[in-house]
Design a protein with these regions (language model features):
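Positively charged n-region of N-terminal signal peptides that target proteins for export
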Residues: 1-4, 19
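Glycine/tyrosine- and acidic-biased, solvent-exposed loop/turn segments at the edges of beta-strands
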Residues: 16-226
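Low-complexity, intrinsically disordered regions enriched in charged/polar residues
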Residues: 7-8, 34
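Hydrophobic h-region of N-terminal signal peptides that target proteins for export
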Residues: 8-17
Length: 226
């Protein structure tokens, strides 16, 4: 991807993306003025919860839970009070819920993935997440889902990553993903020779919305393939 640059850090990665001036972050819905991060900011602010509880997991992490309006929320905070890992927001009045994956990128909290559920079934029209699928002994397919309930033109998806094969870093690879209805995918090949292999990187979707603005979606990836 023209604007993609990946800088590898000890934890995993820090991603920077040179943006056109009119590019905007993904909105919660097409008519919303809030980004996804802003949309969930109030509900995941523990200072606004009732029946707040916390439990120390280790020296750097604590598990928190509480109630906000009609929602029961659980998640994790790091030693600086920043949100990390998977958070769950459950509507106490129905069978709907959402899972959020927070990543610390630089000093910022970013929502890398969010998955909406209806009756425990994933609502792929609203969700942003990735999954892996084993094709054969030498190939894994990385599948990236982004919300499809939006006007999208000039879509493209790019995946920048490196492989860690038996603790040896295998360069940085940028690929343009193939696209099916509602998702993107790319195949990771030639992994059979590795006894242990991890993939670390980021997927970027770029498109124009109904107003002609450039909109981006980012999914950070840190996954064991075997």
């Amino acid at each position: 991807m023209k604007y993609l640059s990946i800088i590898i850090l000890s934890f995993g990665l820090l991603l920077s993306c040179k943006k056109p001036k009119d590019r905007v972050e993904k909105r919660e819905d097409e008519n919303s003025k809030l980004t996804v991060k802003e949309h969930f900011a109030v509900a995941t602010n523990v200072s606004s919860w009732k029946n707040y509880k916390e439990k120390r997991v280790d020296d750097s992490t604590k598990f928190v839970s509480g109630n906000f309006n009609n929602y029961y929320i659980t998640g994790f905070l790091d030693s600086k009070g920043k949100k990390k890992d998977w958070w769950n927001i459950t509507d106490k009045n129905n069978d709907k819920s959402v899972k959020l994956l927070y990543e610390i990128i630089g000093n910022n909290e970013e929502i890398s993935q969010y998955i909406y559920y209806n009756s425990k079934e994933i609502d792929k029209t609203k969700s942003k997440f990735y999954e892996k699928k084993k094709i054969d002994s030498d190939t894994y397919r990385m599948i990236f889902h982004t919300p499809i309930g939006f006007t999208k033109t000039n879509q493209q998806g790019d995946f920048g990553y490196y492989l860690n094969c038996d603790n040896e870093k295998k360069g940085i690879i940028d690929v343009k993903c193939d696209m099916e209805k509602g998702y993107y995918y790319t195949d990771i090949k030639n992994i059979e020779k590795c006894s242990k292999i991890n993939i670390i990187g980021a997927f970027f979707e770029l498109y124009q919305d109904g107003d002609g603005n450039f909109v981006e979606n980012t999914i950070y990836v840190k996954e064991s393939l075997k």
